[in-house]
């Protein structure tokens, strides 16, 4: 009776490499062999524009992501996207609004231009984010820290994990990122019990767009292995 299986492309707070497009293709084919009717969905957050192809081009039925991450190019102020099979998009649109209207109507709050401009600029923005992640990984590796992925590894998201080893080190790192930010550099982040998280979380994001992860930011749950 399984209707859908999903996979998260990005590392998230885990200690693993992001799932590559080739691995997603293998997963899609594996699921299809078991049951061709199962919907195969990919959480594509942080992974857009890392490769020439996106998951829907290697067999995923539907993907979803956030516009304040990669595809918004740092300009989109809010929003998300879903794309994939037309019949699934229609069903999703009916759930988001109401049957019969679907995606034909809906508020954009005047954000269409910045969303489209952000999408246009996104590949270059993601390119810069990846270079920054590689540089960060190399610097901290030379300082003796364990990093994931390694600077020379293939990447499938923009996340760089650094194992800092203690709660104090995690908080100090995030406070350093915030202090060097262009916005709210006077703020000193502290862990707190954020809704939706199992552990206290500390977040540094001195970004022009609230909550943006395509700008330089750092966040972590206060739990082992403290990365």
Q: Which residues fall in each region the model found?
A:
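Conserved C-terminal alpha-helix-loop-beta "cap" of PLP-dependent enzymes
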Residues: 141-227
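Conserved PLP-enzyme active-site core in the AAT-like
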Residues: 1-127, 131, 137-140, 144-148
């Amino acid at each position: 009776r399984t209707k859908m299986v999903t996979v998260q492309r990005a590392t998230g707070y885990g200690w693993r490499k992001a799932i590559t497009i080739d691995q997603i293709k293998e997963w899609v084919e594996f699921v299809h062999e078991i049951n061709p009717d199962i919907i195969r969905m990919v959480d594509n957050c942080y992974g857009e524009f890392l490769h020439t192809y996106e998951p829907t081009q290697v067999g995923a039925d539907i993907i979803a992501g956030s516009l304040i991450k990669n595809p918004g190019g740092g300009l989109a102020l809010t929003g998300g996207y879903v794309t994939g099979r037309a019949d699934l998009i229609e069903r999703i649109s009916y759930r988001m609004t109401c049957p019969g209207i679907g995606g034909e109507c809906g508020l954009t709050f005047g954000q269409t231009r910045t969303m489209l401009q952000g999408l246009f600029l996104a590949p270059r923005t993601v390119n810069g984010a990846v270079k920054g992640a590689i540089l960060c990984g190399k610097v901290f590796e030379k300082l003796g820290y364990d990093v994931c992925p390694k600077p020379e590894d293939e990447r499938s998201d923009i996340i760089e994990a650094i194992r800092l080893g203690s709660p104090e080190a995690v908080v100090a790192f995030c406070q350093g990122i915030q202090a060097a930010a262009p916005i709210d550099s006077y703020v000193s982040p502290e862990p707190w019990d954020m809704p939706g998280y199992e552990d206290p979380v500390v977040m540094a994001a001195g970004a022009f767009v609230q909550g943006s992860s395509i700008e330089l930011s750092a966040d972590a749950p206060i739990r082992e292995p403290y990365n």
